[in-house]
Every structure is written in structure tokens, then in C-alpha cells.
């Protein structure tokens, strides 16, 4: 199992309707476990898991292609 935190910047100003739409769209992606809207330079933090690297990469690609996502910055979680 592989996991990642994906830091997302939104394209829109972040009105409630846009936030709700993006929240639902991100939650609908296979592999996405949690979606948190946060204050600061990052608008959203997504936690995602995949059975292997290819599956996780596919999930991250789907996050990037979601309408309302301007950019992403991914942090792979290393098991310790």
C-alpha cells in the first residue's frame, strides 16, 4: 500500500458553491480517503492511497484533472 498527501490550489476564489463542488468531486475519486479545506497558501489537502505506485499515480492524475484544481504538490508517505 502506498499513500500520499496532495496539496491542492484551487482555480476559483473559493466561494462556498465552488468549495462544495470541488469537495464532492475529489471525494468521488477512487483512492481518495480524506479531503480537508485549509487556510494558507494551500487550499485543500487530500490524503490518497493506492495498492501500488501505478494505482496511486492514477489517483493523483485524476486529482490534477479535476475541474477547479489549478495546481498540485504531492508528498509521498514513507513507511517507517
Regions found by a protein language model. Give the residues of each.
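A compositional/biophysical signature of low hydrophobicity enriched in polar/charged and small residues
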Residues: 1-80
Amino acid at each position: 500500500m502506498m499513500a500520499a498527501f496532495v496539496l491542492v490550489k484551487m482555480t476559483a476564489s473559493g466561494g462556498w458553491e465552488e468549495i462544495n463542488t470541488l469537495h464532492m468531486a475529489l471525494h468521488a475519486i477512487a483512492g481518495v480517503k480524506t479531503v480537508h479545506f485549509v487556510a494558507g497558501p494551500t487550499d485543500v489537502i487530500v490524503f490518497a492511497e493506492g495498492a501500488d505506485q501505478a494505482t496511486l499515480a492514477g489517483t493523483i492524475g485524476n486529482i490534477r484533472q479535476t475541474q477547479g484544481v489549478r495546481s498540485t504538490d504531492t508528498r509521498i508517505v514513507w513507511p517507517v
